[in-house]
Amino acid sequence: MAILFAVVARGTTILAKHAWCGGNFLEVTEQILAKIPSENNKLTYSHGNYLFHYICQDRIIYLCITDDDFERSRAFNFLNEIKKRFQTTYGSRAQTALPYAMNSEFSSVLAAQLKYHSESKGTDQVAETQAQVDELKGIMVRNIDLVAQRGEKLELLIDKTENLVDSSVTFKTTSRNLARAMCMKNLKLTIIIIIVSIVIIYIIVSAACGGLAWPSCVQK
């Protein structure tokens, strides 16, 4: 279970986005955004095995796509956090911004928050108050049909293998960095042991030879 895709848009104008894995997210999202009214609203669209959650406030749409078994409360916690961060960072600039104007900066925020709210350990840290639960009860779920430009039914296609490849690369990089760090740690420990051994040997020899200059052992 995970948040698969997140986007911030003004109407159908995408300002920032991030995808957890490969898929035809943009093609599907464009149709979803076109169906969202401009007034302030919160809603969940259901399509196949996926849910499209959104918050629209001041013409700015905060939308994410999840599996249908992903908790809606977690999805809207994610959207509320994204909305707060986006409004704090950009304010009224979003009302006139060009397409993808915030993507270079805000996509990393989307990625970090998407990961945090998708992981199970993040759920324990996100306190759901009774007010949030009550608010969720008022957010409707509607079925939605998507149609491609050619007229046939449009399905959301997900390729999670892309994320698995990225995860594999990340794991290999992390493992390599860990091995390098352990090697450096062992090298430092070896050097310390050698230095301590030399000092101990020097002290023993000095004691046997009558002093630090080894007067009784060194012939003049």
UniProtKB/Swiss-Prot annotation:
Cytoplasmic compartment spans: 2-188
GO cellular component, one term: neuron projection
SUPFAM superfamilies cross-referenced by the UniProt entry: SNARE fusion complex, SNARE-like
GO molecular function, one term: SNAP receptor activity
Vesicular domain ranges by topology: 210-220
Location, primary (coarse class): membrane
Chain ranges passing through the membrane: 189-209
Gene3D superfamilies per the UniProt record, alphabetical: 1.20.5.110, Longin domain
Keyword Endoplasmic reticulum attributed: yes
Compartments where located: Cytoplasmic vesicle, Secretory vesicle membrane; Golgi apparatus, trans-Golgi network membrane; Late endosome membrane; Lysosome membrane
Source organism, top-level taxon: Eukaryota
Keywords assigned: Coiled coil, Cytoplasmic vesicle, Endoplasmic reticulum, Endosome, Golgi apparatus, Lysosome, Membrane, Protein transport, Signal-anchor, Synapse, Synaptosome, Transmembrane, Transmembrane helix, Transport
One BP annotation, GO: exocytosis
Membrane topology note: Single-pass type IV membrane protein
Residue span(s) of domain Longin: 7-110
Residues annotated as domain v-SNARE coiled-coil homology: 125-185
Function per UniProt: Involved in the targeting and/or fusion of transport vesicles to their target membrane during transport of proteins from the early endosome to the lysosome. Required for heterotypic fusion of late endosomes with lysosomes and homotypic lysosomal fusion. Required for calcium regulated lysosomal exocytosis. Involved in the export of chylomicrons from the endoplasmic reticulum to the cis Golgi. Required for focal exocytosis of late endocytic vesicles during phagosome formation.
UniProt cross-references to PANTHER family, sorted A to Z: SNARE PROTEINS (PTHR21136), VESICLE ASSOCIATED MEMBRANE PROTEIN 7-RELATED (PTHR21136:SF179)
Family note: Belongs to the synaptobrevin family.
Protein name: Vesicle-associated membrane protein 7
Organism: Gallus gallus
